UniProtKB/Swiss-Prot annotation:
Assembly with partners or alone: Part of the Tic complex. Component of the 1-MD complex, composed of TIC20-I, TIC214, TIC100 and TIC56. Interacts with the translocating preproteins. Hydrolysis of ATP is essential for the formation of this complex. The 1-MD complex interacts with TIC21.
The protein's name in its UniProt record: Protein TIC 214
Function, as annotated: Involved in protein precursor import into chloroplasts. May be part of an intermediate translocation complex acting as a protein-conducting channel at the inner envelope.
Family: Belongs to the TIC214 family.
InterPro entries documented for this protein: TIC214
Record bears the keyword Acyltransferase: no
CC terms in the record's Gene Ontology section: chloroplast inner membrane
Gene giving rise to this polypeptide: TIC214
Length: 1786
């Protein structure tokens, strides 16, 4: 059941796949997509559906739809039917028919209303309205102008047409698919229209409620047809505008018009591409370029100047009689063109040639030429032409077949039937093809084996290597063509015939000596099956001695017989098939032999114009034979005339007298370039601009324009990333540091400069902008000088006269006359007051105002100021310029196009004077005010008392009149106890009066209120006394009155409280104003003080935090040698670690052991002193001879484990290392520190991306073993270090040395060199383990990034700045001592090994000298290496793109082992001394390869003496050699210049930006001085003002580049050439990304076994000069390869021929040869017993893998087209390219 279900499911899937891939479904899909290519034809269709109504409207809809579908059907049929496709595919045919029809249709509908039909059904046939609608839709569908520019939608059917077999079914299904899409589209349009008509909301918005607009709406509806016509016309004109109009296109003068000669045009070419049938340029598709004239008389001369003729001689009588047997066809007339009179010549050219000149520049073509004489051959667009050809012995369709060749072949077949090819069967063709190439392969194989045998016999290299075949044009002198022109070296397509030197007169002698005939093979392979051997290596043909091919074959190749063609038929056939370029017209023998041969003249497409650029026009305006109008746009440049000397005299005349042009002597001009990007550069005028449809430009000036598709290539986008650390740092910096004024001014000046440049470029970019601007400037200058300023002077003096002041006519007129308006160039170079710049209307102008006039209200008196005042004035105004530039708006600016300056105000001095006078008046009135102030208090006091008395009486009288109360001061009665009401009334009355009096305080002044308060107090006292008397009188009353007395006491107390509250309230109101003022002042002071203290507090916190952070890592050495920490502890104690509840499992192996020992070396080892005797004999120690106390001590510290018998100190396991490390209290790290050091993300990244598969402590010697051992699988477990005892001995010996040094140290402070040396040794060991030093030798590793290596690989003493010593002197001594010890210790058994060390550190030395701020990477270098390596992931970059500077330092005979206080080379001494003086200076850049030997350890003293002697001898010898070879330079600048000039062949000079402004200022002053008669005074004044700089004046006449570079004026740099990437480079870069070697991330089975190479075999072939001693640069890519015996051309041929099985007839398609299923073939070299190689098989495999790097991509690239005559591009698909192995030799 399951099998049945799977069977059904598989059938369904296969059925679905077949349906999807069927021709019908694909045709429906492509046809449906074609619907979206909407064009102008839809306008007619939509108009008929929208506006036509009624019965006639329905008929019009039907006719429009029918015409639309019929037009599209014709377009689909034209794909299959060739004549219809040619008729519709000719752009000129459609264009010529479309333009008149469009004009007719536009004017026909322009005078009629759409709804005014005026006809009935009976005259419809007469009006032809329905038929016109049908024709409109049909014709416009054929026009095929797309709304989408360059739309691919309509071309999809054409593209897929050639991929299917059943073409008719595909065309039919495509049309059906288009029809379905069209019906759906029209239905959707109809639904939208119905929805609009039915939707009331839309209709209500359209209703016009005003009668005023109804007429306009009706007119709009009536003119709808006209609107449609206008839209259609504009659309078609726009798409015709994509092709330059034949009428308005810029006419270019031909060669005959510019004075060209026939000799200028006769230059040969090999290819003649022609216009394509599918071209969009509007070029002629008739075979104009293929027109060939047959001249019966061979003596006729060719008079056309702009044609290049290829003449072919053949005996038409003999050929027709012998080959064809038909005398009537003897003329072989391909095209007959009758000669006419000269005045009828314009009738000869077709109409298309007159209207559409195909030679016109219709595309943005670049005009590339070699010399000024010749015209460029027209290079057409790449064309797709399908034709059958042979490929690999089979007939195949090629889509890049030359159309002219196919036309010529069809022409030959029609005229010469016997030349028709005989169709052979597939087996015959394949067999014939296989036999040819098999025989060719055998010859190459035999020759190659002979050469290898000669190599075994140790023959001379000159006889073994194959000679390169070169093209020789002078056999006697052995003169060859240059390599770039040699077709044997660079392929046939690149061959060029040597051109004449420019402006050389061709004489008869030159013709005889230098020009000869040549045979060019054209089309023989197409027409005849010529024997391959017969014509392959024919040296001489027809005994022509003027041309020969020098081909030196070595004695190994079999001599091939030179066959001469003897039979007449072969001669005639050969002459017919080979074109002869007759360049020697004096060769009479040649003419006699072929006198009866007529000529076939073939015109090569060549531009008939001689174009020059605009820059060439500016450079040579007055030269002869140069066209006046440039045809090529250059970079925007303007010729600015700086100086015009009408009377040449003196030195200027003597310097310029050699120039022939007298007018040029009078001018000094500069060329000014525009600073904006110019896309028109090198484009021919009248051509179209490139269609940048995918670029987005959002700024006015944008440097790097690219498509939005590549936004992901940008490093950081501001809206996708937010750098919080950078923002935080910026905020802290802004809080701590104040912004400097200089920086602000600099930024402001930069912004101003950018703004000025933008304004200048804007004026320069628009058309007629300079004319408008120049006119405005001149107008503003005239208005200012002669109208505005005189008018202001008149108004000012008139006002002064009205104000009875003296006028200042003379002073104002003097200042007005002093103002000068100097005309300047566009850059601001001043000329004179009357002289205008040349072409100032087009180039631009500036007007500079010297001593500008400012209107002043009055002039100061002319008394002489003191010297001090004058100096102060000049100092204040020293920076102020006494000139300005005029703007378009009449304003003044300091620089051209700068911001407007503020003029001195006319009224500002008046306001200042008024203020001064007011101040004087105040001073005079001060005395009067003082007297008044003294007498004022008396007067105020009298007035106050009078006022108070009046108010008092008034209030008293008013109170009496209002109420009839008992007077307080009059007679009164004592109330009885039964009358308590009156007392309450009295009290109430007093309270009421008090409240009334308090209210009165609001409107009385302070004096009145005080008086009133005083009166009230008196009254209160009186009332209080009266109350007391009354209370005393009532004390004698009965007990019944006690309650009343108690109540009265309460009332009295409440009265007192209320009165006190009132009194305090009054005082508080009076004093509240001052209280509020005081509070506000205190608050403002507190806020201000807080703001002031914020920077101080933040600064203090910042420094405290940084101090705390730094104190974690810095330790001080006290006098007693004990270690103490400053503030915070870097490593916590054991108690803190135990107290943590949550423990982590730490990987102690990730710690750098170098850092551990470095820290331990700083700890005083006092307890080890008593154990010296034990440790001196630690090799023989066992647990029986050691005391238990010492055992316990060692076990506690993890030094020895005596339980492990026969285990010495050197053979400790990883667990012992961990336990000992944990016993040290410094490494009981807290949780935070471990989290920072051992990051989980980092560990994951290392496990994921690490190239080294074993991250344990095992370190393999990468130089002792092959580099492929890194790919050997190793298990990861703890005791893995015991697997490689050799390496462990080497590693642990370093530790042993460290322990020995630390224990036997007699000094209190431990020598720090041990820790440094140990770290350096471990780093070098780490490099060896991960094979970083041998990265260049690993061929499978296609990348190398120098940034993965840290600073200490070149600087051995870089760790020393962190070592503290007691004094500076001791520090210096320790440094030199440490340097020696490092060199001594790091020589660890690397002798007798050739080192390859890339000098990647030289790429960027600045990074090496930077100080390290990240302490993690300093103490843990292994972290830094891998983390920085795999952040960049550079393995997709090919190695040759990165290793551009591949340097290798080889030190073979130099063995450097230095004693402790012994010999140091002088260059290193100098570097050490310089390093001690300034730490930031660079050290000596050379990499010293250290070597050591095992004998050094056994007998160090003897080895040291021998090594020292060898060092001194080698060093002295090397220094002598260096002095002989090295060129002596006086300074580094000369050496750098010489090095630069030898390295770069082209360079340019750029002056320093610091001197740029100074030089320009000097130029401006010079331009002014050369016009003056007496320039001395102006020169002195300009020097005083600082306008002229004397320090950059060139006193010497001849300056060398070195002197200029020393002065800092010129900076030399390579030329930024525009790189034109060739096809090979593009293919290499494209495929280099996909060619990621599989060994990057997985283990290859090929490298499981270790391999060794016996180097004895190679030492024989190494010459003597290769055994160098010092600094030998070597390229591993040039290593000897046996295949290089052959030449590169034959090498490729040999590789390709041996990869195919030619004997197999039923071979598969060529694409299958690159399938993945094919197994890798064996190697090329068979293992031969007589070869002196190692017997191990792996050595040979590794050798060949290492020596054969350059045979992969280029073989595939040239395989099809070059070797097997294959033009089918499908055979070379980059997707199937793979890295294949060598091919065998059968």
């Amino acid at each position: 059941m399951m099998v049945f279900q799977s069977f059904i499911l598989g059938n369904l899937v296969s059925l679905c796949m077949k349906i999807i891939n069927s021709v019908v479904v694909v045709g429906l899909y492509y046809g449906f997509l074609t619907t979206f290519s909407i064009g102008p034809s839809y306008l007619f269709l939509l108009r008929a559906r929208v506006m036509d109504e009624g019965e006639e409207g329905t008929e019009k809809k039907v006719s429009a739809t029918t015409g639309f579908i019929a037009g599209q059907l014709m377009m689909f049929i034209s794909i299959y039917y060739a004549p219809l496709h040619l008729a519709l595919g000719r752009p000129h045919t459609i264009t010529v028919l479309a333009l008149p029809y469009l004009l007719f249709h536009f004017f026909w509908n322009n005078h009629k209303h759409f709804f005014d039909y005026g006809s009935t059904t009976r005259n419809e046939m007469r009006n032809l309205r329905i038929q016109c609608v049908f024709l409109n839709n049909l014709i416009f569908q054929l026009f095929n102008h797309f709304i989408l520019p360059s739309s691919m939608l309509a071309r999809l059917v054409n593209i897929y047409m050639f991929r299917c077999n059943n073409k008719m079914l595909f065309v039919t299904s495509s049309f059906v698919g288009w029809l379905i899409g069209h019906i759906l589209f029209m239905k959707w349009v109809g639904l939208v229209l119905v929805w609009i008509q039915q939707n009331n909301s839309i209709r209500s918005n359209v209703v016009i409620r005003s009668n005023k607009y109804k007429f306009l709406v009706s007119e709009l509806r009536n003119s709808m047809a006209r609107i449609f016509s206008i839209l259609l016309f504009i659309t078609c004109v726009y798409y015709l505008g994509r092709i330059p109009s034949p009428i308005f296109t810029k006419k270019l003068k031909g060669t005959s018009e510019t004075g060209g000669t026939k000799q200028d045009q006769e230059v040969s070419t090999e290819e003649a591409p022609f216009p394509s049938l599918f071209s969009e340029e509007g070029e002629d598709l008739d075979k104009i370029d293929e027109m060939e004239e047959i001249r019966v008389n061979g003596k006729d001369k060719i008079n056309k100047d702009d044609e290049f003729h290829v003449r072919t001689y053949y005996n038409y009588k003999t050929v027709s009689e012998n080959l064809y047997g038909n005398k009537e066809n003897s003329n072989l007339e391909f095209f007959k063109i009758k000669k006419k009179e000269d005045h009828f010549l314009w009738f000869e050219k077709p109409f298309v040639t007159l209207v559409f000149d195909y030679k016109r520049w219709n595309r943005p073509n670049r005009y590339i030429k070699n010399d000024k004489i010749e015209n460029i051959v027209r290079n057409e667009m790449s064309q797709y032409f399908f034709y059958t050809c042979q490929s690999d012995g089979k007939e195949r369709i090629s889509f890049t077949y030359p159309p002219n060749l196919s036309t010529f072949f069809e022409m030959i077949q029609k005229r010469i039937p016997s030349f028709t090819k005989e169709k052979k069967t597939f087996d015959q063709v394949s067999t014939y093809w296989s036999l040819i190439h098999e025989e060719k392969r055998e010859n190459l194989k035999k020759e190659f084996l002979n050469r290898i045998e000669a190599l075994d016999k140790e023959w001379s290299v000159e006889n073994i290597l194959e000679k390169t075949t070169r093209f020789c044009y002078n056999e006697a002198k052995k003169e060859y063509l240059p390599k770039i022109y040699d077709p044997f070296l660079h392929g046939i397509s690149r061959g060029r015939i040597k051109k004449l030197p420019p402006f050389q007169i061709i004489t008869e002698t030159y013709r005889k000596n230098n020009l000869g005939g040549s045979w060019i093979n054209k089309i023989h392979g197409l027409l005849l099956k010529i024997n391959y051997k017969k014509f392959e290596q024919t040296i001489e043909k027809f005994n022509r001695k003027s041309l020969s091919i020098e081909k030196k074959l070595s004695f190994f190749s079999e001599p091939q017989q030179e066959e001469k063609i003897n039979s007449e038929e072969e001669i005639k056939t050969f002459k017919f098939l080979f074109d002869i370029v007759r360049t020697d017209s004096n060769d009479q023998t040649l003419i006699k032999n072929f006198m009866d041969f007529p000529e076939i003249n073939k015109k090569v497409p060549r531009w008939s114009y001689k174009l020059i650029s605009e820059l060439e026009e500016l450079e040579g305006e007055n030269e002869e034979n140069v066209p006046m109008e440039p045809g090529i746009r250059s970079r925007k440049a303007k010729r600015v005339v700086v100086f015009t000397d009408k009377e040449p005299h003196g030195e200027i005349y003597t310097n310029l007298k050699d120039n022939q042009n007298s007018d040029q002597n009078d001018e000094m001009a500069l060329i000014r370039y525009s600073q904006q990007s110019d896309f028109r550069r090198e484009i021919i005028k009248g051509s179209m601009r490139s269609q940048r449809r995918k670029t987005v430009i959002w700024e006015f000036f944008q440097a790097k324009v690219h498509s939005p598709l590549f936004f992901d290539r940008i490093d950081k986008l501001f809206f996708f990333s937010f750098d919080i650390w950078g923002l935080k740092k910026k905020i802290i910096k802004n809080f701590i540091w104040k912004k400097k004024i200089d920086k602000k001014e600099e930024e402001q000046s930069k912004r101003e400069e950018t703004r000025r440049i933008e304004i200048a470029e804007t004026w320069d970019s628009f058309l007629f902008a300079q004319i408008i601007r120049g006119s405005l400037l001149v107008t503003q200058s005239i208005l200012r000088k002669y109208i505005i300023l005189p008018l202001l002077i008149i108004i000012k003096n008139s006002v002064r006269m009205l104000l009875f002041q003296f006028p200042e006519w003379s002073q104002d007129l003097k200042d007005w006359k002093r103002e000068m308006h100097v005309k300047c160039t566009y850059n601001g170079v001043q000329l004179s007051e009357t002289e205008f710049p040349r072409n100032w209307l087009t180039d631009g102008i500036q007007i500079k105002i010297l001593f500008p006039f400012y209107l002043k209200p009055w002039h100061k008196s002319k008394f002489q100021a003191s010297q001090k005042a004058r100096l102060k004035k000049t100092k204040d105004k020293g920076e102020k310029n006494d000139f300005c530039f005029l703007t378009v708006w009449g304003m003044e600016t300091e620089l051209p196009f700068g911001s407007a300056q503020r003029k001195p105000s006319f009224f500002e001095p008046i306001s200042k004077e008024l203020k001064k006078r007011i101040k004087k008046l105040k001073k005079k009135s001060f005395v009067v005010l003082k007297i008044f102030k003294e007498r004022a208090p008396i007067f105020l006091k009298v007035a106050k008392e009078t006022k108070n008395w009046i108010l008092k009486n008034f209030i008293f009288i008013k109170g009496i009149s209002k109420r009839n109360l008992i007077p307080l001061f009059g007679p009164r009665e004592i109330y009885e106890l039964n009358e308590p009401k009156k007392d309450s009334i009295i009290s109430n009355q007093m309270i009421h009066e008090l409240s009334v009096q308090n209210k009165s305080l609001e409107w009385t002044n302070s004096s009145l209120s005080e008086k009133k308060i005083k009166n009230l107090i008196d009254r209160k006292k009186t009332i209080r006394n009266q109350i007391e008397e009354i209370s005393k009188e009532k004390q004698n009353l009965t007990n019944s009155c006690t309650k009343l007395r108690y109540d009265s006491k309460i009332i009295e107390s409440s009265k007192k409280i209320w009165q006190t509250f009132k009194r305090k309230n009054t005082r508080l109101i009076r004093k509240s104003i001052f209280f509020f003022k005081f509070c506000i002042e205190q608050m403002s002071i507190a806020i201000f003080l807080g703001i002031i203290n914020i920077p101080r507090i933040t600064t203090q916190l910042f420094f405290e935090s940084t101090k705390k952070i730094l104190d974690k890592y810095i330790y001080k050495n006290e006098e007693n040698g004990e270690k103490k920490k400053n503030t915070l502890y870097f490593i916590s104690t054991i108690k803190n670690l135990i107290s943590n509840k949550k423990k982590m499992s730490y990987d102690l192996c990730s710690l750098s052991q170098a850092y551990v020992f470095y820290k331990l070396s700083q700890i005083k080892v006092s307890n080890f002193c008593k154990l010296k005797a034990v440790l001196e004999y630690n090799i023989c120690i066992t647990s029986f001879f050691v005391k238990n106390k010492i055992k316990v001590f060692f076990q506690e510290h993890g030094i020895f484990h005596y339980e492990l018998k026969n285990k010495t100190f050197l053979n400790s396991e990883v667990n012992q290392w961990k336990n000992w490390l944990r016993s040290q209290y410094q490494y009981n790290l807290p949780q935070i520190s471990w989290a920072r050091l051992v990051t989980q993300n980092w560990k994951n990244k290392i496990n994921k991306d690490s190239l080294v598969l074993n991250p344990s402590l095992t370190k393999e010697d990468s130089y002792e073993k092959k580099k492929f051992d890194n790919y050997k699988k190793q298990k990861f477990f703890e005791a893995d270090s015991l697997l490689n005892p050799k390496h462990n001995v080497k590693k642990d010996s370093i530790y042993n040395l460290f322990c020995y040094k630390s224990i036997h140290s007699t000094e209190k402070n431990f020598d720090m060199s041990i820790g440094i040396a140990l770290d350096n040794c471990l780093v070098s060991s780490f490099l060896e383990k991960y094979n970083i030093r041998g990265m260049g030798e690993i061929r499978h590793r296609k990348y190398l990034d120098w940034r993965i290596l840290n600073f200490w690989f070149t600087k051995k003493v870089t760790i020393e700045p962190w070592v503290d010593t007691k004094s500076k002197k001791k520090y210096i001594n320790t440094k030199v001592q440490n340097y020696q010890k490092i060199d001594k210790i790091t020589q660890t058994d690397l002798a007798n090994k050739k080192r390859n060390f890339f000098d990647w550190m030289g790429m960027n030395e600045e990074i090496l000298n930077q100080r390290i701020t990240n302490f993690e990477f300093f103490f843990f270098p292994e972290f830094f290496l891998f983390s920085s390596t795999y952040k960049m992931k550079p393995w997709v970059i090919p190695i040759k793109l990165l290793l551009l500077n591949f340097n290798e330092n080889i030190n073979v005979n130099k063995k450097i082992i230095r004693k402790k206080k012994g010999f140091i080379p002088s260059n290193e001494k100098e570097s050490l001394r310089f390093y001690n003086l300034n730490k930031e200076e660079k050290e000596s850049a050379g990499q010293v390869e250290l070597e050591s030997d095992k004998e050094t350890k056994r007998n160090p003293e003897a080895a040291r003496l021998n090594q020292e002697k060898n060092i001194e001898e080698n060093f002295a010898e090397s220094t002598i050699k260096k002095r002989k070879n090295k060129k002596q330079y006086k300074s580094n600048t000369e050496a750098e210049l010489d090095l630069f000039l030898t390295r770069y062949s082209r360079f340019q000079l750029r002056w320093n930006c610091f001197f740029n402004q100074k030089i320009l200022n000097n130029v401006k002053v010079y331009c002014l001085l050369v016009r003056l008669n007496n320039p001395n005074e102006i020169a002195v004044s300009s020097i005083e003002r600082g306008e002229m700089s004397l320090d950059i004046l060139m006193i010497e006449k001849n300056f060398t580049f070195a002197k200029l570079m020393k002065k800092g004026i010129l900076i030399i740099e390579p030329v930024r050439l525009s790189v034109q990437n060739d096809g090979q480079l593009i293919i290499y870069r494209t495929i280099g990304i996909s060619l990621v070697h599989k060994n990057k991330h997985k283990i290859s089975k090929r490298y499981k076994k270790k391999s060794y190479i016996n180097k004895k075999f190679f030492e024989k072939s190494i010459t003597k000069y290769q055994n160098k001693t010092v600094n030998k640069k070597k390229n591993n890519y040039d290593f000897f390869v046996p295949e290089k015996i052959l030449s590169p051309k034959r090498r490729r041929e040999f590789r390709i021929l041996i990869c195919f099985n030619l004997k197999k007839k039923n071979a598969r398609d060529t694409n299958s040869r690159f399938d993945k299923n094919i197994q890798n073939l064996t190697t090329v070299l068979h293992k031969k017993k007589d070869l002196d190689l190692d017997k191990d098989k792996n050595n040979l495999i590794n050798l060949k893998s290492f020596l054969w790097p350059n045979f992969k991509l280029e073989d595939l690239a040239c395989m099809n087209r070059y070797w097997f005559n294959t033009t089918n591009g499908n055979h070379f698909s980059m997707i199937r390219i793979r890295m294949y192995t060598r091919f065998p030799i059968p």
